[in-house]
């Protein structure tokens, strides 16, 4: 595989959309077609510092509630670390990168869900400077169904405990942004896992390998 062929692919979706199984599928597909396992990342997280920030964002502290603006800025601090120290170096070495969430999550959750789009766009522009994935697969699912699925996994984290209208706004933002960007592909995550995986593979197989 040549350096020029390396790609950054991201899986996005609301809680319970099936990102983990989709990522496992894509990871195996990339390894089969390139002979190399991709560098897998998650957001927030993916570096020692970013993982500590993840805990601040995901774990509620009733004694010092995280305000929406702080949440947004912390997530971008983690993302800046990940992009600078993991994603860009991997791509420069010709390695494929597979991300569990990226900037689209902030646009949907903090921009749409929290109503902070001007702040999100400003911080995104300042930290990422136009850097974006080559392909984003957005697993679309009704928030009510997604939260039901998430609850079956165990205790919900701070983000997962938000009111349903937060997730409805986030979903609407995801879909709006997907309609404006051909590099974002919407996958119907209400289907069976087999059907979802079939749709994902169809997208991957259409790429130049």
UniProtKB/Swiss-Prot annotation:
Enzyme class (EC, first level): transferase
Gene Ontology CC, one term: cytosol
Top-rank taxon, per record: Bacteria
Reactions accelerated catalytically: dTMP + ATP = dTDP + ADP
Pfam families reported in the protein's UniProt record: Thymidylate_kin
Annotated coiled-coil segments of the chain: none
Annotated ATP binding sites: 13-20
Keywords annotated in UniProt: ATP-binding, Kinase, Nucleotide biosynthesis, Nucleotide-binding, Transferase
CDD domains reported in the protein's UniProt record: TMPK
GO biological process: dTDP biosynthetic process; dTTP biosynthetic process; dUDP biosynthetic process
EC number per UniProt: 2.7.4.9
Family annotation (Gene3D superfamilies): P-loop containing nucleotide triphosphate hydrolases
MF (Gene Ontology): ATP binding; dTMP kinase activity
HAMAP family: Thymidylate_kinase
Family: Belongs to the thymidylate kinase family.
Function: Phosphorylation of dTMP to form dTDP in both de novo and salvage pathways of dTTP synthesis.
Name by which UniProt lists this protein: Thymidylate kinase
Organism: Shewanella sp. (strain MR-4)
Lineage of origin: Bacteria, Pseudomonadati, Pseudomonadota, Gammaproteobacteria, Alteromonadales
Name of encoding gene: tmk
């Amino acid at each position: 595989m040549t350096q020029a062929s390396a790609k950054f692919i991201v899986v996005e979706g609301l809680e319970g959309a099936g990102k983990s199984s989709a990522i496992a599928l894509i990871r195996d597909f990339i390894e089969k077609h390139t002979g190399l396992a991709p560098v897998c990342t998650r957001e927030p997280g993916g570096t020692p510092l970013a993982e500590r920030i993840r805990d601040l964002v995901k774990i509620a502290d009733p004694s010092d509630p995280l305000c929406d603006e702080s949440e947004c800025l912390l997530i971008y601090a983690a993302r800046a670390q990940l992009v600078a120290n993991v994603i860009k170096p991997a791509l420069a070495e010709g390695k494929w990168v597979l991300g569990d969430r990226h900037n689209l999550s902030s646009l949907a959750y903090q921009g749409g869900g929290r109503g902070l789009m001007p702040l999100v766009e400003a911080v995104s522009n300042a930290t990422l400077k136009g850097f974006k994935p080559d392909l984003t697969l957005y697993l679309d699912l009704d928030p009510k169904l997604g939260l039901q699925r998430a609850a079956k996994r165990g205790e919900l984290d701070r983000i997962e405990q938000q009111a349903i209208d937060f997730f409805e706004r986030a979903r609407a933002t995801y879909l709006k942004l997907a309609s404006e960007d051909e590099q974002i592909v919407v996958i119907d995550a209400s289907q069976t896992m087999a059907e979802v995986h079939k749709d994902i593979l169809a997208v991957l197989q259409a790429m130049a390998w």
